[in-house]
């Protein structure tokens, strides 16, 4: 399931905006095929390799106050073997890890030459950000409801495969439209669909509908980029500017971020490639945890938006509005090569991770990460309630 993550965007060849010898060689090949050296040099420098739109740092940073709780003595068991966080970093080629508990900073660590000032590519974590921007657009009155037809805001969809598809169907990956996300098949949709968004909209409108909307889950990267186009049409603005207005500035993001475009001065990909620091990814998790509240009584999301976003769809019990759901009530934004924002409302826990896995998706690394996060949660609870004494 999760191995079919967003890589459609990663076959870019024409989006080069700046290059030295190394960066030029990297731009000429899919991000999926970057060497380990290229990953570590490229992931923090996407804005120097591809066309992006800047999202300026907030004028007033939300401080991540250090908590009294610490993880220095933390160990956990994975596959019957004792592990430390250092083991996790080494075995999963992790570049950064931040843990927030009750809104305070419990742990922060970097490796592989990464640091708190560098941005890092999100891959499909951007989808969850788009989901929250949809909530903001509803709160602002640009969109009336997720039950509206997508074609209400993007009339070109009124004919073709998406003529009766709602925004909710698209957010839940349940449009019923045929889409092949097999990356090993060169004739698949994910490998052959257009890179430019306007061409993609036409391409997707000509696809076949296999199932009634809302009845079947099918991971569809092209559709998430379509979601970006619908949102852009509804708000009458680009996604990066709207993200700055609704989240980045008012919530106090510390650093500039960058969102990849389909061409120079083009449009953002709704399904991929926001680039931000790990601290600001953690703040995005905190923003979700706080239901978009910017200050007491002042929020940029509808009251129940995050509850609805993290509720199972009829088509898939493990998926909400571009968030992957966990059995324990937590949810996460997930990107290939090991990018995560975990949000656990009951435990008031946020975990943000930057990685450079050797493959786009590895189930064993996913299982290890889940074990790490659950073990951290249990460890902190024992600390809080003095259960180790």
Language model: regions and residue ranges:
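Bacterial N-terminal signal peptides
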Residues: 6-15
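N-terminal leader/targeting segments and the immediately adjacent pre-domain N-terminus
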Residues: 17-115, 143, 198, 371, ...
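Active-site helix/loop module of the DD-peptidase/beta-lactamase fold
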Residues: 121, 140-178, 206, 233-271
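Active-site-proximal alpha-helical segments within enzyme catalytic domains
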Residues: 223-230, 270-294, 339-355
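Active-site Gly/Thr loop motif
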Residues: 255-256, 303-351
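Active-site-proximal binding-pocket segments
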Residues: 242-244, 248-310
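Catalytic-site signature segments of enzymes, centered on catalytic residues
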Residues: 116-117, 184-264
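Active-site SXXK
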Residues: 103, 120-146, 170, 227-231, ...
């Amino acid at each position: 399931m999760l191995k079919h993550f967003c890589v459609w965007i990663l076959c870019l060849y024409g989006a080069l905006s700046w290059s030295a010898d190394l960066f030029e060689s990297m731009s000429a090949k899919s991000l999926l095929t970057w060497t380990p050296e290229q990953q570590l040099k490229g992931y923090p420098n996407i804005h120097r390799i591809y066309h992006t739109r800047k999202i300026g740092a907030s004028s007033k940073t939300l401080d991540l106050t250090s908590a009294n709780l610490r993880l220095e003595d933390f160990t956990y068991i994975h596959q019957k073997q004792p592990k430390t966080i250092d083991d996790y970093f080494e075995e999963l080629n992790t570049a950064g890890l931040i843990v927030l508990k009750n809104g305070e900073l419990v742990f922060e660590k970097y490796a592989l030459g990464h640091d708190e000032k560098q941005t890092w590519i999100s891959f499909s974590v951007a989808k969850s950000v788009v989901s929250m921007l949809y909530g903001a657009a509803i709160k602002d009155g640009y969109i009336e409801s997720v039950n509206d037809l997508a074609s209400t805001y993007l009339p070109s969809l009124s004919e073709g495969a998406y003529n009766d598809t709602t925004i909710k169907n698209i957010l839940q990956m349940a449009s019923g439209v045929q889409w092949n996300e097999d990356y090993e098949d060169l004739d698949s949709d994910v490998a052959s669909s257009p890179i430019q968004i306007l061409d993609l909209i036409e391409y997707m409108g000509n696809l076949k509908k296999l199932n009634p909307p809302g009845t079947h889950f099918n991971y569809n990267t092209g559709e998430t980029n379509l979601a970006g186009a619908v949102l852009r049409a509804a708000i009458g603005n680009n996604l990066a500017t709207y993200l700055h207005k609704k989240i980045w500035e008012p919530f106090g993001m510390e650093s500039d971020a960058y969102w990849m475009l389909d061409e120079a001065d083009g449009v953002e990909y709704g399904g991929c490639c926001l680039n931000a620091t790990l601290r600001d990814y953690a703040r995005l998790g905190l923003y979700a945890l706080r239901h978009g509240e910017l200050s007491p009584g002042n929020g940029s999301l509808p009251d129940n938006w995050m509850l609805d976003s993290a509720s199972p769809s009829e088509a898939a019990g493990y998926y909400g509005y571009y968030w992957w759901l966990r059995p324990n009530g937590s949810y996460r934004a997930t990107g290939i090569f090991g990018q995560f924002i975990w949000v656990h409302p009951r435990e008031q826990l946020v975990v943000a991770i930057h990685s450079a896995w050797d493959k786009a998706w590895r189930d064993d690394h996913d299982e290890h990460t889940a074990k790490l996060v659950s073990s951290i949660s249990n460890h902190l609870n024992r600390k809080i309630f003095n259960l180790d004494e």
